[in-house]
Structure formats: C-alpha cells, structure tokens
C-alpha cells in the first residue's frame, strides 16, 4: 500500500490500456516550460490505435498548435466547466496565434477526435489592449467533440469548417469569448451545440488578469457569439451570451446557409440578438428564446434582412429590456410569431414609440401573442405581401397598423384601448 502512494498520476495513466500521460512524455505543467512538444508526442503515440491522452492537474504552457489525431481524446480532469478564480485543474496557457486570426488553432481536431475537461487561458492577452488571436478550437471532418471546456479569454472560440464536416458535438462550453464564440460552416449532417454560455465575468478575476468594465465594453461592441453559415439540420439547445454585439447571426458563405432548430436560446445586453441575413428555405425553428437589447443604436432583438430567402418561425419567446423594437422583418419569405411576449420595458418604463413588430416584405403571421407595452403592437407596412394577425392581446389591446388593406387577415384580437 505504501508503494502505491509513490506511483505518480502520470504512471498510473500510462499503465491503463489505451491511456497516455503527457507527464510521461516530458510535460512539466509548471506554466514556464513549453509543453507543446510533449503533449503532441503523447497525442501522436495514442494515434496508432486510438486512445486517451491524460492532462493531470497543472498549468501547461503551449506556445504552438496541437493536432488531435483521429480516434484520440485529449482529456483533462475537470468534469464540468469551472470558475476562473481559483484557477485549478488542467489549465492550458496559450501564447501562440497572436495576431494571426487565420493561423492554426490552438487545437486542430479531425475525424473522431475530442478535447474534454480543461481550461484555456491566454495569459498575454490584456484587457486594456485586446489583440486578435487564432481560434482556440478548429474542427473538420466527422464526429468530433469539444466538451466540459472553460474559456477564460479566447478571442475566437470554436470554428467548425469551412472544410467539409458532419456531426460536431459542442457541449458544456462556458467562458469569455471576445470577438467570436462559435462559427459553423460546411456542415452537411446534423451538428449539435448544447449547454453553452458566454459571459464577460470569466475574465473579470484578478487571478487571470481580468477586469469587468473593459471586457464588458469590448464584448457588446464586437462579439458575435453564434455564427451559422452552411449547416444542415443544426440542433442548438440551452445557449446564452452576455453582453454581445450580435447574439446569433445567420450568413451566406461559399458553402451555403443554415437551417435548424434552436431551443432555449438567449442573448442579453445585445445590440441585436438574432440577425438573419441568409438561411435555407426551410429555415429556422426558434422556441423558448429570451432576448434583451441594451446597447447601440439598433436595439432590435430579431432583425430579418431583405437578403433572407427562408422561413423564420419563433414560438414561446420573450422580448424585454430597452429595445427600440422587438421584431423587424424585411424578408421576402415567411416570418411567424406564436405565443410570444413582446415589450420594450426597462425599469418600469417603455423606451420607444415604434411598433413592437414591423414588416415590409414577404408574409407575416402573428398569433396568440401578448404585447407588454403600449406602443403600436404590429405594423403591416406597404410592400408586405400578406399577413395573418389573430388572437393577440396587450396592455392596451392589440394595436395594429394596416397599410396593406385586404391582404391582411386581422381577427379575434383584444380591441385596442384608447389611453385615458
């Protein structure tokens, strides 16, 4: 028994079939020695038959990029994301990729590879002089996983594609991302993003050189948290960002655009929560969303641009805060809101007199919604092809501006109540 106590964690990990320890390959985990080569050697050793490379507790300085081979998992000790103070567990101190946004990522993942259970911190990044860095994770190929990860101050978080890829799994990733959180492109078979939260307070602790105010300001001015180019049937569940420039952005790339389902998503202290520039015709299914805008001149939680050619459907979503409006659509396609709560309330006062919902193109449905503040509820502007507005109520009834005449079906709404 006494001898067992002398066996190092690294030796135990080495002895376990299919498991390799970076300590046995020469990693120091002392935050001073460059451990890039030792970690990569362990990953390459595991590649022959597949296996798990263990990162015991410690601070591993990585000055370069790490390639995770097919069939290999880089495994830290953390079973869940962690807070930044005290900074414990398996911690990667990354210094490579500074000034090279398109350079190699800290972790390059291919087929059937994974990174789990660790924290990433960029110790040379400064809150008062934020500098671009390469992506922390870059995924391509089939069936790769990033799970139970804490990002202290990543400039760019997780990039999937643009190379061909399918069935990515991004789970339980928490932390601070400064410019971009997760970017998906080139995915042709259902990717999954689950239980993700981005927030400035992960880089507010003195232990990691953080300060709330400059990080908070940089994020709401610059951060795009979730960006979707080409992805087929993307499943996104339980995600959140605070603060942010654009929470969820849908774009056209060389590979195409997105469709998918988005449930339990949220964005707070945003300029725009959801911005739809391009999607596939079958479009977006958004449910149980919570959207608050506070910063900038736009302050529209859901903005659908005239370049959008696909369907946007929102069900059981809530809009509040000092929004200028809640939903504005210029789309030539379909936009639908059902069972939503919409308001511009902040501190008990409504902040604008613009319509809560406004559309000037395509076709619109607003059904079973409640309007929590007393500006116009829905504006059907010239250029809108058709609208159905039914079974809505509000603090002053459903106030509807109709500029399209009999192209609108308006029925069974609470009558408008004139101010007293």
Annotate the PLM regions:
Residues 1-11:
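Bacterial N-terminal signal peptides
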Residues 19, 50-52, 57-59, 65, ...:
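Detector for repetitive beta-architecture
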Residues 22-56, 67:
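Acidic Gly/Asp/Thr-rich repetitive segments characteristic of extracellular carbohydrate-active
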């Amino acid at each position: 028994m006494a001898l067992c106590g002398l066996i190092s964690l690294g030796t135990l990990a080495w002895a376990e079939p299919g498991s390799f320890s970076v300590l046995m390959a020469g990693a120091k985990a002392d935050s001073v020695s460059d451990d890039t080569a030792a970690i990569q050697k362990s990953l390459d050793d595991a590649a022959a038959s597949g296996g798990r490379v263990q990162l015991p507790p410690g601070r591993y300085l990585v000055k370069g990029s790490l390639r995770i081979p097919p069939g290999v998992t880089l495994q830290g000790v953390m079973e869940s994301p962690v807070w930044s103070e005290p900074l414990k567990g398996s911690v990667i101190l990354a210094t490579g990729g500074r000034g090279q946004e398109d350079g190699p990522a800290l972790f390059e993942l291919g087929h059937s590879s994974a990174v789990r259970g660790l924290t990433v911190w960029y110790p040379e990044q400064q809150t008062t002089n934020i500098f671009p860095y390469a992506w922390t994770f870059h995924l391509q190929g089939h069936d790769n996983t990033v799970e139970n990860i804490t990002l202290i101050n990543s400039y760019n978080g997780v990039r999937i594609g643009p190379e061909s890829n399918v069935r990515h799994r991004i789970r339980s990733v928490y932390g601070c991302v400064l410019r971009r959180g997760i970017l998906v492109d080139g995915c042709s078979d259902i990717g999954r993003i689950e239980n993700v939260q981005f927030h400035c307070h992960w880089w507010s602790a003195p232990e990691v050189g953080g300060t709330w105010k400059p990080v908070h300001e940089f994020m709401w001015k610059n951060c795009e948290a979730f960006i979707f180019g080409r992805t087929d049937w993307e499943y996104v569940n339980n995600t959140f960002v605070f603060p942010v420039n654009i929470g969820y952005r849908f774009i056209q790339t060389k590979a195409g655009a997105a469709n998918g389902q988005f449930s339990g998503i949220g964005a707070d202290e945003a300029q725009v929560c959801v911005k739809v520039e391009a999607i596939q015709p079958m479009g977006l299914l958004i449910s149980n969303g919570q959207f608050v805008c506070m910063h900038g001149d736009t302050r529209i939680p859901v903005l659908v641009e005239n370049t959008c050619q696909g369907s946007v459907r929102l069900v059981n979503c809530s809009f509040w805060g000092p929004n200028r409006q809640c939903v504005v659509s210029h789309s030539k396609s379909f936009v639908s809101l059902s069972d939503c709560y919409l308001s511009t309330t902040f501190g008990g006062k409504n902040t604008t007199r613009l319509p809560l919902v406004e559309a000037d193109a395509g076709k619109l449905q607003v059904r079973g919604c409640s309007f929590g503040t007393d500006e116009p509820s829905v504006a059907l502007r010239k250029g809108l092809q058709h609208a159905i507005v039914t079974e809505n109520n509000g603090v002053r009834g459903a106030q509807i501006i109709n500029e399209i005449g009999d192209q609108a079906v308006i029925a069974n709404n609470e009558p408008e109540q004139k101010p007293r």
